Amino acid sequence: MSTRKTKEIESANVTFIDILNNVPPENASLTFFAALPCSRPYLNDSSPYQPITLPSRYNKNDSSDMFFCKTMNTPSTFPHILAFIRKEILRSNHLTWENLDREQIGPDIVLLVHLGSGGNGFRDTAHGGVLAALLDETLGCCIESWAIQLHASEQASSATRPRSYTANLNISYHAPVESPGIIIVHAWLKKREGRKWFLGAKILGEDGRTRAEASALWISERVAVM
């Protein structure tokens, strides 16, 4: 079976923000999820979210993101993924993570994931490591989105933006996740202290029940002083 690919844009050095702004979500995934009731809060006209291509699913023609772009991009693993970002994160030049009412505004990044049986552990049950990878990837998309906008507002555009890496990911599994099936992954920024980024995430079933929760620490590289 051939691996599906998102539409490519003509750039040898495509960036994360290029993908968010210029690569539309795959029509097949939009059509698939639009038929499911769980997607309506994110796809309706009044939604605070914008559908995006998950950057790690985009084929960059190099060795980056091979796990999500190739290995887990098959009919038996993750046949469909549709990502969403809070519109404010893309559009605001004065972002703040302080005093945000998460009950009111919701998560920063949402992933709708169609799980195939290729990621199973027990029979008809998604492997915990697969769920951990989805949590980590959603958290990564969250921090990268924030970091790009904050970097643009805090420093000269010519300054190099440091990379950030997972330093700690603590997951609590509450219930098995049936597979094949549909899950919803939420991720949000809690706070930032210098190079440290504190985030939260959770996995919901199609019925809205929480299946897993995570807290994470990401750390940005030190910026070299010239």
Protein language model annotation of sequence segments:
Residues 1-179, 192-226:
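Terminal targeting signals and extreme-terminal segments of soluble enzymes
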Residues 179-186:
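A structural-propensity feature for long, helix-poor, extended segments
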